[in-house]
Amino acid sequence: EEVRRRIDRAININEVCDVNPFGVIATMAAYNEGGEWLDALRKYLRGNYEYLCCFFKERLPQYPVLPLEGTYLVWIDCRASGSNSDGASSIGSDAMTLRLQEGQKLMVNSGTMYGPGGEGFIRLNIACPRALLADGLERMARLFYREVF
């Protein structure tokens, strides 16, 4: 009985397994009537990605933006930051992430969170209003210009 209780608690720790009537109705509405909304959302997110790409091309061209892979999470290659003579980054993605969070109040994810190969990359969520994205990119550029270059 104790094992059953522990398993049940582990499954329901975030209450994601419980179905409630409102969730069922919302899910049905999303599947049956959400096509236009989803199309508009995808178009808006594509616009945010294009805005970000233009921003980096014009203001931070040394940082390549990777193509989207079916999501709204953008990978930015920051390996050029403070490069040593051998081309390796002297500022790791963890340090850059911390500087963005503490100095600019901008939350990004360090590539190292995602395992080997992530060092030197940061991940940015662009599923937000464009004005918020623009503000975040300006803060990112401020930090890069002030501390990295």
Residue spans of the language-model regions?
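A short linear hydrophobic-aromatic micro-motif
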Residues: C53, Q62-V65, M107-T112
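Conserved glycine-rich beta-strand-loop-beta hairpin in the small C-terminal domain of fold type I
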Residues: P21-V24, M28, K43-C53, V65-S81, ...
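Surface-exposed helix-capping loop/turn segments at secondary-structure junctions
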Residues: E36, F56-V65, V148-F149
